[in-house]
């Protein structure tokens, strides 16, 4: 298989603070990965480096056969879709939904004297329709609910027809119904034969949609587990990743985790050892 992403011995520090330590990670074509860990584990930092939004302090990063440091990232970014609350925060409340989606064609937030052709308009409408958001096309961004915004953000991330798609905690802040609708949409995208390779950042196993194939778990900036989902999402690995005894269950394509009584703490120590 062809590698779409390869991180080799990647580290990142800010002053004396080590954020990532010697991260190795390879994503092959057709794989869909979950980046899992607690708050501050380094998930979003790894995703930002892997999506060419941040340079590491050391190590090498190859994205879509281009090496960071040797490529103009402004030319690479349109090939990489990104759903992030940080991007959404930059959208003006008065911006129309159609404009939010269309502007991704130019790799910017908001419109700035762009002219869109019929292909762009048709694609934007088709994506919104496929995600159950066609009725929002003329609404202003500031009037949307959290669930509606996520669907529009996903349409925007898919607008350039990316080769990779990064989803940074897409279900954060959503109610149960909105979360399940979003996860179902992601599963449908994955099932398409021309789906981009996806990377989902989360700290909840319950937010992993059906169809994801692999997981990379992080703790304090270091890799704990990496590989096929069923091999990584075990009680031992997840307990070590989150630093407490956890039970992991799997039912009808979905994972869940819950805490175990304090007496099971020895299990975490053994997993670390």
What are these regions (language model features)?
Residues 5, 19-22, 137:
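Conserved structural motif at the start of ABC-family nucleotide-binding domains
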Residues 59-69:
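Conserved ABC transporter NBD signature motif
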Residues 67-81, 114-117:
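ABC ATPase NBD coupling module
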Residues 115, 140-144, 148:
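Conserved ABC ATPase signature
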Residues 165-169:
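Catalytic Walker B motif of ABC-type/P-loop ATPase nucleotide-binding domains
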């Amino acid at each position: 298989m062809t590698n779409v992403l390869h991180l080799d011995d990647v580290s990142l520090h800010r002053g004396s603070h080590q954020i990532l330590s010697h991260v190795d990670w390879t994503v092959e074509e057709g794989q869909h990965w979950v980046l899992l860990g607690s708050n501050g584990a380094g998930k979003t930092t790894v995703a930002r480096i892997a999506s060419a939004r941040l340079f590491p302090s050391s190590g090498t990063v190859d994205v879509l056969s281009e090496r960071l440091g040797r490529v103009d990232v402004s030319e690479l970014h349109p090939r990489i879709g990104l759903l992030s609350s940080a991007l959404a925060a930059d959208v003006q409340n008065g911006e129309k939904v159609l404009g939010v989606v269309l502007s991704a064609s130019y790799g910017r937030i908001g419109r700035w004297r762009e002219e869109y052709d019929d292909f762009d308009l048709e694609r934007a409408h088709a994506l919104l329709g496929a995600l159950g958001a066609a009725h929002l096309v003329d609404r202003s961004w500031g009037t949307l609910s959290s669930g509606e915004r996520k669907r529009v953000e996903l349409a925007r991330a898919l607008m350039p027809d990316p080769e990779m798609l990064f989803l940074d905690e897409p279900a954060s802040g959503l109610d149960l119904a909105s979360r399940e609708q979003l996860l179902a949409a992601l599963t449908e995208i994955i099932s398409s034969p021309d789906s981009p390779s996806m990377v989902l950042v989360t700290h909840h196993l319950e937010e992993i949609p059906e169809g994801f194939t692999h997981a990379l778990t992080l703790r304090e900036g270091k890799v704990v587990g990496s590989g096929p989902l069923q091999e990584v999402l075990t009680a031992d690995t997840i307990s070590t990743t989150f630093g407490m005894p956890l039970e992991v269950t799997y039912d009808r394509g979905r994972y869940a985790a819950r805490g175990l009584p304090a007496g099971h703490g020895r299990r975490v120590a053994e997993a670390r050892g």
